[in-house]
């Protein structure tokens, strides 16, 4: 049997939140179970000399409008009603991501994960 697909996430990524919201239907439809793996995106960007799409695409004509349209399409397609833009975005998630690793060691991954995502993207 092949290994479970991994879902790499950072609480600060709205796209990761939206993907997470779509995963239960994928798991139900396919019978696969995703393994959730925390990844500090800021660290990845720094280590690779890159920057977030929000920074690298800033100033491109019509990009914010297109992103908003695509987000709305995704929300409708996956029947996601819990998403709200975070007025504090972008957020430094270093402590949140360290916290989820610690919570996992303590057997508290699920409640920590749900609370962090809820307060980041459902009720910021």
Model regions and ranges:
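Local sequence-structure signature of Cys/Sec-based thiol-disulfide redox active-site neighborhoods
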Residues: 1-22
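Structural alpha/beta surface segment adjacent to cysteine/selenocysteine redox centers
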Residues: 18-120
């Amino acid at each position: 049997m092949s290994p479970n697909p991994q879902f790499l996430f950072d609480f600060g990524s709205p796209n990761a939140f939206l993907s997470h919201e779509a995963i239960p239907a994928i798991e139900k439809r396919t019978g696969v179970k995703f393994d959730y793996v925390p990844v500090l995106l800021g660290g990845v960007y720094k280590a690779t000399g890159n920057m977030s799409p929000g920074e690298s695409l800033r100033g491109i004509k019509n990009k914010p409008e297109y992103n908003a349209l695509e987000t709305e399409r995704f929300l409708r397609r996956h029947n996601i009603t819990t998403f709200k833009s975070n007025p504090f975005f972008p957020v430094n998630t270093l402590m949140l991501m360290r916290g989820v690793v610690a919570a996992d060691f303590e057997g508290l991954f699920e409640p920590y994960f749900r609370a962090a995502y809820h307060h980041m993207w459902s009720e910021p």
